[in-house]
């Protein structure tokens, strides 16, 4: 059966040689957090966090500054080891895993502050994300044996295909640091996708973007989900973005979940209005 992906508002066929992976689209969730928490001294930064994310769901994590949102991402990626609770990724317990192991298991992440290698080319930044797929030996790399060149050719093709999905292939030889802000954000997402995740974590992806760039970002997030058939979880303060594309939203306040539901349910929840949305409306008024 032919595969398709989202392109400028339309579904178009995916080439037979595409790097877009075949995925098991069973009903099992991609992520299950049960009673997750972490304590720093006497401070419970995250407490009794429970969340399930479907295999191709776009989920939002919102809350006031200091609510614990980025700490949740740090727990999921094992920047911090939880002091309580469990995390299942694709049904596998992640207890005791390192950040690198979590990445190989299927979680990729972007950060609030862009973390590109500014002096490297756009293509080389994407190739860094492909390092998990390199299979040549150290000797092959040092001596430039045929196995090395075969892997390099494959990496180039994969990087260019990923860039083409976001119309960035013409920028492949540009220095990453020379790109406009919005393009740097896209490149960071492309590099994360190069690791072949089943769950993509986006930490404030619209930060610093103008309305036009934010609208393009919204389309790109939907494109990512539809093209790669993965789940996306994002932290974001732009409520138009969150309410516009997130199918499920979780609200944190002081490290605890105060509400979960659809965008309509969240907007009508009194606790959310008081803790988060109400503050935004007060500022707008």
Language-model features and meaning:
Residues 2-285:
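Glycine-rich phosphate-binding loops of nucleotide-dependent enzymes
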């Amino acid at each position: 059966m032919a595969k398709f992906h989202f392109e400028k508002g339309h579904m178009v066929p995916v080439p037979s040689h595409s790097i877009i992976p075949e995925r098991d689209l069973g009903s099992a969730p991609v992520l299950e957090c049960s009673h997750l928490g972490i304590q720093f001294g006497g401070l419970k930064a995250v407490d009794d966090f429970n969340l399930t994310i479907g295999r191709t769901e776009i989920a939002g994590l919102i809350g006031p500054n200091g609510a614990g949102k980025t700490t949740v991402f740090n727990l999921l990626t094992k920047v911090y080891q939880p002091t309580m609770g469990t995390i299942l990724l694709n049904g596998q317990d992640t207890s005791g895993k390192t950040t690198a192991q979590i990445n190989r298991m299927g979680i990729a992440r972007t950060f609030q502050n862009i973390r590109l290698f500014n002096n490297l080319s756009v293509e080389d930044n994407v190739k860094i994300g492909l390092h998990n797929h390199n299979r040549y030996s150290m000797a092959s790399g040092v001596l430039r044996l045929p196995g090395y060149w075969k892997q390099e050719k494959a990496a180039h093709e994969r990087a260019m295909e990923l860039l083409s999905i976001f119309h960035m292939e013409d920028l492949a030889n540009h220095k990453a640091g020379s790109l406009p802000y919005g393009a740097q954000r896209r490149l960071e997402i492309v590099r994360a996708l190069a690791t072949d995740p089943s769950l993509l974590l986006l930490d404030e992806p619209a930060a610093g973007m103008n309305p036009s760039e934010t609208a393009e970002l919204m389309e790109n997030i939907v494109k990512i989900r539809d093209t790669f058939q993965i789940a996306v979880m994002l932290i974001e303060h732009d409520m138009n973005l969150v309410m516009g594309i997130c199918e499920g939203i979780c609200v944190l306040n002081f490290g605890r979940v105060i509400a979960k539901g659809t965008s309509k349910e969240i907007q009508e929840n009194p606790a959310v209005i008081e803790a988060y949305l109400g503050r935004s409306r007060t500022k707008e008024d």
